[in-house]
Design a protein with these regions (language model features):
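Basic, polyanion-binding surface patches
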Residues: 2-201
Length: 201
């Protein structure tokens, strides 16, 4: 029988870099991956909690399921782990302040994180962010805890497309806007953005 030849498509320099990469190099390389920004919320009222997702992706279209990765050290994770239902709020391009509000570890309480933004109550009791790019209402099927994170498979029970014109993305450790906001579109076509006073007002 003939032998099987295995060819590596990486140049020698890439193979060497992969073999000797240190933690700093790995993290720097990971920061080159642009990704959407989502806030995961559970509960309502005084029981509501939220945390920034490390990543969100579509696991399956039929049946509809998301793969949601969250940091287990975040203050909101304990409430998230106790709840079987959660909402994934995909942030729009003009919601950078909300992203900063849900990032960090500084407080064990989550109440203050909901002080900005307009929050709505869904039929099943979940809090969701108005005017975001999209909202997925999910039910946890399985949670896999690995290292610092929890990998959650969530069945999508309902999805809503929001009114955001652009998307918020994370790249190289910073947030940026992809696409134009409604106000930028208004200015481009010579209209006054919403919220700006008209002449004579």
């Amino acid at each position: 029988m003939g032998s099987t030849n295995v060819h590596c498509l990486c140049p020698p320099s890439a193979q060497s870099a992969r073999a000797t990469a240190d933690d700093a190099t790995i993290l720097a390389a990971a920061r080159q991956v642009a990704s959407g920004v989502s806030v995961v919320t559970v509960g309502a009222g005084e029981e509501r909690a939220g945390l920034m997702a490390v990543s969100v992706s579509l696991l399956s279209a039929d049946p509809a399921a998301l793969l949601v990765c969250v940091n287990r050290a975040r203050p909101g994770y304990s409430a998230f782990a106790r709840s079987r239902r959660f909402a994934v709020n995909v942030l729009g391009g003009d919601q950078r302040e909300i992203a900063h509000h849900f990032t960090g570890f500084r407080d064990a309480s989550d109440a203050w994180r909901f002080d900005i933004g307009r929050w709505l109550l869904l039929a099943d009791g979940l809090s969701c962010l108005a005017d975001c790019a999209a909202v997925f209402e999910c039910e946890t099927e399985e949670t896999i805890e690995r290292h610092a994170n929890a990998i959650v498979i969530g069945w999508v029970r309902r999805a809503v497309i929001g009114g955001a014109s652009g998307a918020l993305v994370r790249w190289r450790g910073a947030y940026d806007q992809l696409g134009w906001s409604r106000d930028e579109i208004s200015r481009a076509v010579g209209l006054r953005p919403s919220g700006e006073a008209q002449d004579g007002c």
